[in-house]
Amino acid sequence: MHAVVPSAGRGTRFLPITKSVPKEMLPVVDRPAIEYIVREATDAGITDVLFVTRAGKQAIEDYFDAEPGLEADLEKAGKDEALEYVNEYKKYARVHSVRQGHPLGLGHAILQAKSHVGEAPFAVLLPDDLMEPGSQLLRKMIQVRQALGGSVVALLKVTPEQATAYASTAVEVLPVPEGVDLDEGQLMRITGVTEKPPLDEVKSEYAVVGRYLLDPAVFTALENIEPGAGGEYQLTDGYARMIGLP
């Protein structure tokens, strides 16, 4: 399975450091945030990761590339622990990148992956949202898709005020199929969704958080939507159209 990681954002909330360092490369403990995303995808069985980037993001690709000179120097110096860290990229899924020429929204970013993904279902991981490694969220989402088919998105319980910054969803609880590692009450069908609604239009206490498993039909849907919230092409509008939501 492919994973698409939109990574073209400017990171304005982290200025001034993001003038020269991609926000995805900012450290979380001892490694860049983007490594946690690729590790999460790999741990869920994904073998191919596509970064959707822009100019100035070359450091992301470089981080997951071989550097034979450094590896040889570390080996020669007997710095085995450092060499092990440097070589961790070899354990991860293959990585690729494509440019998003214009910042026209998340839906537009996902469209840039169409030729790479082809006609297969794929995952989307938003690098701003880091998950607890032990949660196995993506693996559980794959279980849901295998059991029920269709597209799967992750939901987060939020306050009404917080919901105005997310895609707010109307939901109905579903029974959990055998073989899916969820508790009763954790599996829901989305019956309505609104991107960043005003407070009086929040649909429930559940909002979409940055993990998706999508059918390739979403590409056709994204090609036929109008700009939404913020004048951008929203992924929310694309998958809502794909599954027939108003």
What are these regions (language model features)?
Residues 1-76, 100, 136-140:
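N-terminal glycine-rich phosphate-binding loop and ensuing alpha1 helix
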Residues 24, 94-96, 189:
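Conserved beta-strand segments of alpha/beta enzyme cores
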Residues 33-36, 108-112, 238:
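Well-ordered alpha-helical segments embedded in enzymatic catalytic cores
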Residues 45-46, 118, 147, 189:
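Short loop/turn motifs at secondary-structure junctions
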Residues 70-73, 80-177, 214, 223-225:
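Conserved beta-loop-beta/alpha segment of the NTase-like Rossmann-fold superfamily
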Residues 123, 142-146, 174-246:
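Catalytic-core segments of class I nucleotidyltransferases/pyrophosphorylases
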